[in-house]
Amino acid sequence: MFHVVPSNKQELLTQVLIAFIQDDYAANKRHVFDASSIVVESQGMKHYLNMEIAKQTGLAMNIDYPLVSREIYRICRLVLGDDVPHDSPYKREYLVWNIYGILQSDAFSEQPQATLANAYWQSQNDPNLQCFRLAKQVADIFEQYSIYRSDWLAQWEQGNTLGLSDALEPWQQLIWRMLTQDNKQHPAYLRAAAIEGLANATELLPNPLYIFAVNTLSPTQITFFSELAKHTDVYLFFLNPCSEYWGDLVSDKVALKRQLANSIEILQAEEQRHPLLANLGSQGRALFNQLQDIHYPDITDNQLFIAPELDGHNATSILHTIQADIASGMLNPTAINAIEPDRSLQIHSCYSPVREVQVLHDELLRILQHDPSIQPHEILVMCPSVEEYAPFVNSVFRPVHKPQAPGSPQLVCSIADRAPLDSESAVMMFLDMLELPDSRFSVLKIIDYLHIPMVQTKLTLTPDELSMCQLWLEQANIKWGVNAAHKNGILHSNDSDEIYSWEWGLQRLALGCLHSAAAGQPANYDYVIAIEGLNTRVLAKLLVLIELLKQFRNALTGAKSIAQWVVLLQEMLAELFASSNHEEVLKTIHKAVVDLGKQVEFAGFDGLLELAIIRESLTDRFSIPDALNQFLTGQVTFSSMVPMRSVPFKMICILGLNDGVFPRVSAPNSIDLIAVSPPQKGDRSRRNEDRYLFLEAILSAREYLYLSYQGQSVKDNQTLEPSLVLQEFIDYLNRKFTTPDCFAETVIQVQPLQPFSTSLFDTSSELY
C-alpha cells in the first residue's frame, strides 16, 4: 500500500521515520546488521538523516540513501534478474561516449536525417571537440526524455515520428534507434517491464520502502511507486507546508485574470489566499496535486502538523507568526502592536557582496552573544552561488593577515558545495598542465606551479628556496617560450629568436654557476652571477620541473586510446605531485582519471581521443560540487542554494537575493524538444525550483531568518531592486502586518558603504 506521511516540520517526519524503522526491525525480528534503504533527493538530506538517526537512537549504520532514479533501477534489477546489468549503460556518463561514437560513425553520418547534426559539428574549427559537446547535450536531453517523455522514446523505438520539430526530431530519433539496437534496456523500458513482473517478484521487493522529503517526482516515477505499492508498503514522507488543501491556489498573475471576470465572493476568497503559498509553492503544489490524483487520502491528514505555539516557540515572534500563517493556508492580517519587536526576521540592503558578508558576520556575533541557545552548527548561510561569496567568506571569517586578539569573538565556518576545480589549486594546475601543448610557457604560469604545495613537496622546495627561484627568474629575464622553435610555433613565424625564452634564461643561470664575475662572458649570453655553493641544488630542482613540463608537453600531443591517456595522466600525477599532506586531493584527481577510463571502456568506445576531449571531460568532472564535503561539520555552514535540501536550522541566512540573480535563470538547451513542445504535468522548472526553495527556507528557519541583497549601487549609489521572490515576500509582510507606516521599511536595514562608517558606532543608531 502507498502511505503518504505529511507534515510541515522536518523534525516530525524524521521522528516518524525512525519509529517506523524501529517497529519494522522489532516486528520482523531483523538483525542490526540488516541493511535499510531510505530514498532521498540530495546528499545533504542523507547527511542530516544519518546525524538525526544517530542522535535519537545512538547508532546509524548500514543505511543506504539512494536517489530516486537509482532506487527505481535497483528495484528493476530485483524484478527482472541478473540480465539487467549492475550499472545502466544509459547513465549519462556512459551515454555520452555511446552517442559520441554514433555521431562519429559512417552508419549515422551517411543517413539523410543526420545532415543537420553533421553540419553542426563538422563545420567548426575543432570538429571532434564540437562533436563531443553535442554528444553531451544529447545525453542530457535523453536523460530528461526517459524521465519526463518516455512515451516519445517508445514511439521513436517503433519507428514513429511525433512531428515535434523538423530540424531536431529526425536526427535525435535516429540516434535513439541506433542506441537501442544494441541494448534495449533503457530506463523507460525497464520501468515498464518491471511493473509487469512485480506480481511474480513480491518476495524480492523491499518491504517497506521509505521515500523521505522528496519534493518533486515525475509522473512516470509516481506511477512506478504506485504500482510497486500494490505489492509492498511504500511510505512517502512529504514536507507539506500547509495543513489545509492548497492544491487549487494560483499565482498573483492568474488571480488577476480571474478577478476581471469573477463575482465579488470569489474576489474575497482570492484576497484571503496565502500569497507565499500561491506565488512560491508551484513545485510543491504540483507534487501535492499528483498525489491527490492517485487518490491517497493520507495527504490531507493533519495529525503531524504543528503550529509554533505548540512547538515550544514564541508564537508572537514575527517569524513564527509568518510560519503559522503559511501552515493555515490563509492570510490573516495582524496588528503590529500585538507582536513584540524582535530580530527573528531581518532584511539587509547592502552595497556589495563583501559588505553582505561583513554585516552577516557582525549580526551572527550579536545573536550568539544575546542568545546562548544558538550554537554555530545551528546556523546555515546560503547563496545562489557559494563560489561567488567564498573569497569574501574567507577574508571576513578567516582573516589570515589579522592575528586574533585574546578574548575576541571568533566564528568558525565551513564552505560546502564547492567544486574541486574552484577550491583545490592542485586540480587547477593539473588541468592547466593539460594545456601544455598550447601553452606559451609564461614565467608567471610556472611560478604559479611552484606555489602549489604538492609540487613544492615533490621538489622538496622550501619557502626560502621558492623566493630564491623567483628572484633568479627575474634576474635571468625569462618571459615566455621554451625556445626559438616554440616561439615560432606560437607566433606562426620563422624569425623569432630565443631571447627571453626558458632555454636562453636557464643557460644564463647555468653559466653563472660556472663563471666568476671576473671571467669573460660568451658572445651570445649575458650570464647571471646569482648562484653559488649549495644554491646550485635549488637551481637543479627548478631545472627538473621545467624538463618534466617539456617532456609532458610533447607526450600530450596527438590522439590516443583511452588506456594510453589514463597511463600518461597517472604518470604526470606521480612525477609532479607528492601526496604527503595532500593525499585526499591527489586521490580525487586519480579517481577522476581512473573513472574516465572505466566510463569510456564500459561504453565500448575504442576509438582515439584528442587531448581537448580528455581535458573537457575532466573539467566537467571537477566542476561538479561536492555535496557532502563541509556540510554540517559542527560550524557555521555556508552553501549554495540547493533544491531539495530542506534541512531545518535554528538560523537560516540567505545572501545575494538580487534582481536577475535569484531565481536563477538557465538557458534552455537549444536542441531540447521538451522546451519547444507544450508543457506537461510534472515538468521540471529551474525557476519554480528556486521559488519553492525560498519558501522551504522560510519554513526551515526555527528561530531566525536573515535575508540580504545588494540594494545600492557601489558605483553611483542608485537604488537596486531585490530579487522578485524577496519583493513578493516584502509585499506579503506589508499585507500581513498592519502598521501606521509601511511595515517593510521598519524591517529592511540599509547598511552603509564602508564597515567603518560612523553610523555603525553610534549607540543611538539602529545599525549599532
Predicted regions and their residues:
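Polyanion-engaging groove/track-forming segments
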Residues: 1-768
